[in-house]
Regions:
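Hydrophobic membrane-insertion alpha-helices, especially the h-region
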Residues: 5-20
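A structural signal for short, hydrophobic/glycine-enriched beta-strand patches
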Residues: 20-174
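A transmembrane-helix-recognition feature enriched in membrane-embedded lipid enzymes
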Residues: 171-190
Length: 191
């Protein structure tokens, strides 16, 4: 029995190191993002009256990206989760327009999705992403998985990382991303 425990622990350690290496290698910005016509801004949990801190960082990154790329259009992705007062994308738009001063004409909405795979599929169905280069903005820990899922959907994305607001959230998020990535690998939906 102890032998089985050691083998399982070794498998966990190897999978954790491999997946964390993938996550960390994907945390960089692609210089080619300059060419992007569309940028998907992936949603995250919202509170009753505002976006979460992690989502605020994504929105600030999106606002900066739009300032630096005057022809780009942002697609705000995110449906309504449990205990959320509205779809994430609606609050994202509200925050960007009201707080950051983003031009509302440059913000499109995808408000039916519940996860990253649905974010991408729904945005692709609504907007001509296959006809143009697109970027994806998400928290740095989430970027590798988001890019791979976009590639699986037939897109050629550039990654633009948003910082994680604090170290405890970063640690918890890396563990959650490990679990999400492992789940996709084990169900055959990754790679």
């Amino acid at each position: 029995m102890a032998q089985v425990g050691r083998v399982l622990f070794a498998l966990f350690c190897v999978s954790f190191v491999c997946i964390q290496s993938l996550i960390i290698s994907g945390e960089h910005a692609d210089p080619e993002a300059e060419e992007a016509q569309y940028v998907l801004v992936l949603g995250a949990h919202i509170l009753q009256d505002r976006p979460s801190d992690a989502l605020i960082e994504r929105l600030k990154t999106a606002d900066t990206f739009l300032d630096e790329h005057p022809d780009a259009i942002a697609i705000l992705c995110g449906g309504q989760g449990t205990n959320e007062p509205m779809p994430e994308s609606h609050m994202m738009r509200q925050y960007m327009v009201d707080t950051l001063g983003t031009d509302p004409d440059r913000l499109l909405i995808e408000d039916k999705s519940r996860n990253t795979i649905q974010n991408i599929a729904n945005a692709k169905a609504l907007y001509p992403l296959e006809e143009s280069r697109c970027a994806v903005i998400s928290s740095d820990f989430h970027l590798a998985r988001a890019r791979i899922l976009m590639e699986q959907a037939g897109l050629d994305p550039y990654g633009v990382p948003a910082p994680v607001p604090n170290l405890p959230l970063a640690a918890a998020s890396h563990m959650r991303e490990y679990c999400s990535t492992l789940g996709l690998i084990l169900t055959g939906r990754y790679f």
